[in-house]
A protein has these predicted regions:
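Short loop/turn motifs at secondary-structure junctions
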Residues: 26-28, 78, 127
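Donor/substrate-binding cores of folate-linked one-carbon enzymes
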Residues: 21, 81, 85-189
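N-terminal Rossmann-like dinucleotide-binding module
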Residues: 1-40
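Short, surface-exposed acidic-centric catalytic microdomains
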Residues: 25-65
Length: 189
């Protein structure tokens, strides 16, 4: 069974979705890692008995030092893939050159890279927004796009649009994980 590591910073709703829909079915979540000791997602990892690493990013003077510790933790668990699921850190080449990872981003990349992507997507002139799953690279939200899912604006208010983006991102994340792992199985044959 393929193994993944999941990185998160906040509520952990995407971690919970992965655990509910994939863990011990399609793959094994071998570790959940957060950079925030107060992150809500910690409870999901505990509930599922998943090994949990808390690496408080505020205790490091440099981003590279944090990333080195993160790489060390991930490598210990030997995942086939690392998944950034609401992990709110800009990663340096210390991470991106050593860890194979995908990221969930709440816009149709290359539009609206970085923070506040949902808000910026909602306010732009396009009729649709959406989510992207992409490979993690040293460029912020700049890695190869694996898949995208659109969300029509259709005169929705912001709360309705945001809710739909958050609903669809979980589905896209699961599809992206399975797609990458399946692609790697085919290439390995």
């Amino acid at each position: 069974m393929k193994k993944i590591a999941v990185l998160f910073s906040g509520t952990g709703s995407n971690l919970a979705y992965i655990l509910e829909h994939l863990h011990n079915k399609e793959l094994e979540v071998v570790v959940a890692i957060t950079n925030r000791p107060e992150a809500g997602g910690i409870e999901f990892a505990k509930e599922y008995g998943i090994p949990l690493e808390i690496i408080d990013s505020t205790t490091f003077d440099k981003r590279e030092e944090f990333d080195a510790e993160l790489v060390h933790a991930i490598e210990y668990y030997k995942p086939d893939l690392t998944v950034l699921a609401g992990f709110m850190r800009i990663l340096t080449p210390v991470f991106t050159d050593n860890i194979r990872a995908i990221n969930l981003h709440p816009s149709l990349l290359p539009l609206h890279k970085g923070l506040y992507a949902i808000e910026r997507s909602y306010e732009d002139e396009n009729e649709v927004g959406g989510v992207s799953i992409h490979r993690v690279s040293s460029d912020l939200d700049g890695g190869k796009v694996i898949l995208q899912k659109e969300v029509a604006k259709d005169g929705r208010d912001f709360e309705s649009y945001e809710s739909e983006v958050k609903r669809i991102e979980k589905i896209a994340l699961v599809e992206g994980i399975l797609s990458v792992l399946k692609e790697e199985l085919i290439l390995a044959k």
